């Protein structure tokens, strides 16, 4: 049976199904409803409101170190408050899965700025996952947990206002109970003193290389990254809600590379896709996060000169600015 749910409601369901045991959050639109929808799952998930985003981040990280799968949520400006522990966790790694939701707000519907928090993933050198609809909001939580544990990394789970609040049909799965790994005292890993941080940094860089390879292989197999080949004339690289807009607007025969793992970018997959199309567009909201890196790799593409770097996109804007219709 399928259920009509918002992205936030579906994310809460994903937390339950992924076997996450601890969720801490600080309220703020567009993220608030995630934690609000968790108490219905009873004692399977311990959930709490924290006094601020930094505390929420630290509570969840403590649960991760102890071995539980852990989750915390906040709106995008809240990650400014939580940046200190997040960056340090990037160097220390995890025990149980550790997933941090940043709910971005293009067009400033309820926020004091329009910051693009994808840059936090690059700065903190951690993995980033972006769902594009309610079903993916649920499904990608489990994949984010698997990535976190396999690669010993926090995962930034980036949504946007439209992904959070738009509704779609969601097919449920069963909860998978996660067997918590035993906590082992490890001062080298979990005490990020300067000497330990110095030794951990090479491990972080190696982790990014492995994550990029994962994005080109396993992430395609499990549906996190999707390649949809058309007639080869036009190709679109996109992610998050922008995929929905582009999919509706571009004509039949258009090829799509839809990325769910958006940091690190799977550059070999992108090169292979670009080689199969005559003209390449990058469609994304706010900053040219993907576009800049793709162009830096020597891949010719068109993006922000058409779509701009402010405010939300929608089908009408993409149709007018990109296709000139």
Question: Predicted regions span which residues?
Answer:
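Thiamine diphosphate
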Residues: 1-134, 162, 291, 296-325
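Flexible, low-complexity linker and terminal segments
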Residues: 1-8, 131-325
């Amino acid at each position: 049976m399928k259920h009509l749910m918002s992205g936030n409601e579906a994310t809460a369901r994903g937390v339950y199904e992924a076997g996450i045991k601890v969720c801490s959050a600080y309220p703020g639109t567009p993220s608030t409803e995630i934690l609000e929808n968790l108490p219905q799952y009873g004692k399977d998930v311990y959930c709490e409101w924290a006094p601020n985003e930094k505390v929420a981040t630290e509570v969840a990280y403590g649960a991760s170190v102890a071995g539980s799968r852990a989750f915390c949520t906040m709106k995008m400006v809240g990650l400014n408050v939580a940046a200190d522990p997040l960056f340090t966790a990037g160097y220390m790694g995890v025990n149980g899965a550790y997933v941090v939701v940043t709910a971005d707000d293009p067009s400033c519907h309820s926020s004091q700025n329009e910051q693009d928090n994808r840059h936090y993933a690059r700065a903190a050198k951690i993995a980033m996952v972006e769902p594009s609809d309610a079903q993916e909001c649920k499904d990608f939580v489990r994949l984010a947990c698997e990535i976190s544990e396999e690669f010993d990394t926090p995962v930034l789970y980036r949504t946007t206002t439209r992904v959070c609040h738009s509704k779609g049909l969601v097919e449920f799965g069963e909860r998978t109970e996660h067997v918590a790994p035993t906590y082992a005292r490890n001062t080298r890993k979990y005490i990020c003193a300067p000497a330990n941080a110095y030794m951990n940094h090479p491990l972080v860089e190696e982790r990014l290389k492995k994550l990029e390879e994962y994005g080109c292989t396993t992430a395609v197999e499990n549906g996190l990254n999707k390649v949809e080949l058309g007639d080869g004339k036009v190709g679109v690289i996109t992610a998050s809600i922008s995929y929905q807009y582009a999919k509706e607007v571009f004509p039949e025969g258009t090829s799509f590379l839809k990325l769910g793992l958006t940091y690190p970018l799977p550059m070999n997959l992108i090169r292979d896709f670009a080689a199969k199309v005559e003209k390449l567009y990058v469609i994304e909201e706010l900053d040219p996060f993907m576009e800049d890196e793709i162009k830096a790799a020597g891949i010719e593409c068109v993006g922000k000169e058409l779509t701009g770097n402010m405010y939300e996109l929608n089908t009408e804007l993409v149709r007018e600015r990109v296709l000139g219709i």
